Swiss-Prot record:
It comes from the Bacteria. HAMAP family: His_tRNA_synth. SUPFAM superfamilies: Class II aaRS ABD-related, Class II aaRS and biotin synthetases. PANTHER family: HISTIDINE--TRNA LIGASE, MITOCHONDRIAL-RELATED, HISTIDYL-TRNA SYNTHETASE. This is Histidine--tRNA ligase. NCBIfam families: hisS. Its main location: cytoplasm. GO terms for molecular function: ATP binding; histidine-tRNA ligase activity. Its EC number is 6.1.1.21. InterPro entries: aa-tRNA-synth_II (IPR006195), aa-tRNA-synth_II/BPL/LPL (IPR045864), Anticodon-bd (IPR004154), Anticodon-bd_dom_sf (IPR036621), His-tRNA-ligase (IPR015807), HisRS-like_core (IPR041715), HisRS/HisZ (IPR004516). It comes from Chlamydia felis (strain Fe/C-56). GO terms for biological process: histidyl-tRNA aminoacylation. The keyword ATP-binding applies.
Length: 430
């Protein structure tokens, strides 16, 4: 029987020519990941890599009533009966690592990650059972300008990869006085309309009231539309905090708007929450989101510690780049050596190693195809330069390099060719 992928997953690999699936091309993922590393480095964030699986309790602390915890986790028992879960989201493992490694001894901890997540999602466009997330967590500081800084990093990432039509939507879920006031009013409002709510929202009424605002059920939409806004009940202190974030975004010319119905899918968010929205082809959809989660560290067994962060689904980023026509695969500027005769094999093997030591990406075609077919393969493999090596080249000690894009050639001794290749690579825009 032929082996095949399970549902909900996909391969990322280099030999993709179908435009529809170009978002899965290895080179594109490398380009986007390079942007992430560069942007995070500019802001002083360091990469963290947590295990693929954690003790299940790590995610239960993050919100027992969230859809992820209740319906979507890949949970299993190991051979000793311990409950383990494949990582469904990135924040809870970072918090676990923060506590485990006593990082609270530092005043300010700034982390980012690019990791696969696992959720038993219903099959639909843009949703996968293994997906990849760029996440960022800033733990230890509570300040409105820290929140704005995190948002500016997110915005710089979207700009650097070439996404268009982006906007940040924000809301303030509050904590303390603000949340108490709002919960009371919201509960009374939904109680008046309880019989008209969907079965899912009726369940959430007693477990996570705010999540009703996030309902996608048809029967809930008119009720949600008329629900009171939390911004009508925000305390003076919280309003000042929120205003400072908005002022900072204005100062950086980051497009944004307030969405008083915005809540997040995980239970641990407090105070400011946000989503990055793109509008394309008449549709709006989120490419990432996050907020402040000042209570999660303490809920996970650590000291009371403020924190904020976000997560970005990279599959949607790649697919949106494709839809917007902004996918450009980076050039590798590689040289392909083609030994025309077997007596040139040893020369190509040794010279290729020397070229790589000079920083010139070099590969060798060992197939000994007919010359015409070998050049076709070099073209298909996106080789920038090609060098044919046969008996004539070995005897004359003169080599010819062909530029596959301009179809121009240059010849010389081995040393002359090396210098020309280095010049071409260093002076050509990648």
């Amino acid at each position: 029987m032929k082996v095949a992928l399970p549902k909900g997953v996909f391969d990322i690999f280099p030999y993709i020519t179908d435009a529809k699936h170009m978002w899965r091309h290895t080179s594109l993922w490398h380009r986007v990941e390079d942007v992430i590393h560069e942007v995070c480095d500019l802001y002083g964030f360091s990469e963290v890599r947590t295990p693929v699986f954690e003790k299940s309790e790590v995610f239960l602390h993050a919100g027992e009533q969230s859809d992820i915890v209740k319906k979507e986790m890949y949970t299993f028992l190991d051979k000793k009966g311990r409950s383990l879960t494949l990582r469904p989201e990135g924040t809870a493992p970072i918090v676990r690592s923060f506590i485990d490694n006593s990082m609270n001894q530092r005043d300010d901890n700034k982390f980012y990650y690019i990791l696969p997540m696992f959720r038993y999602e219903r099959q639909q466009s843009g949703r996968y059972r293994q997906h990849h997330q760029f996440g960022l967590e800033a733990i230890g500081v509570r300040h409105p300008l820290r929140d704005a800084e995190v948002l500016s990093l997110l915005w710089n990432f979207y700009s650097a990869v070439g996404l268009q039509g982006m906007q940040i939507q924000l809301n303030f879920l509050g904590g303390g006085t603000t949340r108490q006031r709002y919960d009371k009013v919201l509960r009374e409002y939904f109680l008046e309309h309880f019989e008209s709510l969907s079965s899912l929202s009726k369940e959430r009424f007693n477990t996570n009231l705010l999540r009703i605002l996030d309902s996608k059920e048809t029967e809930d939409q008119e009720i949600i539309k008329s629900a009171p806004s939390i911004l009508e009940y925000i305390s003076d202190e919280d309003q000042k905090y929120f205003d400072e974030i908005l002022t900072a975004l204005n100062s950086l010319d980051i497009p944004h708007s307030i969405n008083p119905k915005l809540v997040r899918g995980l239970d641990y968010y407090t105070d400011v929450v946000f989503e990055a929205i793109t509008t394309f082809g008449g549709h709006s959809y989120a490419l990432g989101g996050g907020g402040r989660y000042d209570g999660l560290v303490a809920a996970s067994g650590g000291p009371s510690t403020p924190a904020c962060g976000f997560g970005v689904g990279l599959e949607r980023v790649m697919q949106t780049l494709l839809a917007q026509g902004n996918i450009t695969l980076p050039s590798s500027h590689k040289l392909r050596l083609i030994p025309v005769e077997s007596q040139a094999d040893s020369f190509c093997f040794i010279w290729a190693q020397h070229l790589r030591g000079l920083g010139i990406p070099t590969e060798i075609d060992w197939t000994h195809k007919k010359l015409k077919n070998a050049l076709k393969t070099a073209d298909a493999e996106k080789a920038t330069f090609v060098c044919l090596v046969g008996e004539r080249e070995l005897l004359s000690e003169q080599l010819t390099i062909k530029d596959m894009s301009s179809r121009q050639e240059f010849s010389g001794s081995k040393q002359e060719v090396e210098q020309r290749l280095l010049y071409e690579i260093q002076n050509t825009s990648l």
